[in-house]
């Protein structure tokens, strides 16, 4: 225990003893200065690149500047497509969502697709035709059945309330108009105006009293 006590005493003496003058140093050991300042410096070294680029809005501007670069790369892809006709044929079936991305740069994307469709994807259209033919007979049967009863029900219900609604709307604004004029005279503004000058009179009375005194 004695050794621990001596160690604690030495630490206390070291922290309490003043240090030689040094520029930028308070002259004594301060926990907030000796420990926190190195941490702040270390954090500033780690986080330095982020403020150099700027805050988030600046990052958004950088992304906007990169957009034209992407548009420049798209024509390169168009130039590469004619060289890779054969590998693109099997990929056209699942890569249907890429079609909306292609017409963005210009109409040039449509011309190669039109040439590819009649030449290569003819076998791809064949499986789609029977699939599209099968759901057609099933789909019309289902909607026609519910639509027939719904069509007569929908016009009957809205027509009845629509007819009384137009006269009701003009009638509603009329009743609030007459009560508005009586509300204005009910306000206590006119009686408050004469009270204001009455409050000013006692001030003059005080001055007169002072003169009298």
Swiss-Prot record:
GO terms for molecular function: structural constituent of tooth enamel. Its main location: secreted. It is found in: Secreted, Extracellular space, Extracellular matrix. GO terms for cellular component: collagen-containing extracellular matrix; extracellular region. One of its GO terms (biological process) is enamel mineralization. Residues 96-213 are annotated as: Disordered. It comes from the Eukaryota. The modification Phosphoserine is found at residue 32. Residues 1-16 form the signal peptide. Residues 161-194 have a biased composition (Pro residues). It holds the Pfam family Amelogenin. Phosphorylated by FAM20C in vitro. Keywords: Biomineralization, Extracellular matrix, Phosphoprotein, Repeat, Secreted, Signal. Residues 96-105, 114-160 have a biased composition (Low complexity). Plays a role in the biomineralization of teeth. Seems to regulate the formation of crystallites during the secretory stage of tooth enamel development. Thought to play a major role in the structural organization and mineralization of developing enamel. PANTHER family: AMELOGENIN, X ISOFORM, AMELOGENIN, Y ISOFORM. Belongs to the amelogenin family. Interacts with KRT5. This is Amelogenin, X isoform. It comes from Bos taurus (Bovine). The lineage of its organism: Eukaryota, Metazoa, Chordata, Craniata, Vertebrata.
């Amino acid at each position: 225990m004695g050794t621990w006590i001596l160690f604690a005493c030495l630490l206390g003496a070291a922290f309490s003893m003043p240090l030689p003058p040094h520029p930028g140093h308070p002259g004594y050991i301060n926990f907030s200065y000796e420990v926190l300042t190195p941490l702040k410096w270390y954090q500033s070294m780690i986080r330095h690149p982020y403020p150099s680029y700027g805050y988030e809005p600046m990052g958004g501007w950088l992304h906007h500047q990169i957009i034209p670069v992407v548009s420049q790369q798209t024509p390169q892809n168009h130039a590469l497509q004619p060289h890779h006709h054969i590998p693109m044929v099997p990929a056209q079936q699942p890569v249907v969502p890429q079609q909306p991305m292609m017409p963005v740069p210009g109409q040039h994307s449509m011309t190669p697709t039109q040439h590819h469709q009649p030449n290569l994807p003819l076998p791809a259209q064949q499986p789609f035709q029977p699939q599209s033919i099968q759901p057609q007979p099933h789909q019309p049967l289902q909607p026609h059945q519910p639509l027939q009863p719904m069509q007569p029900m929908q016009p009957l219900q809205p027509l009845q309330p629509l007819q009384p609604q137009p006269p009701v709307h003009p009638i509603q604004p009329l009743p609030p108009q007459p009560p508005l004029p009586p509300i204005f005279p009910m306000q206590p503004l006119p009686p408050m105006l004469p009270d204001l000058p009455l409050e000013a009179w006692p001030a003059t009375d005080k001055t007169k009293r002072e003169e009298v005194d």
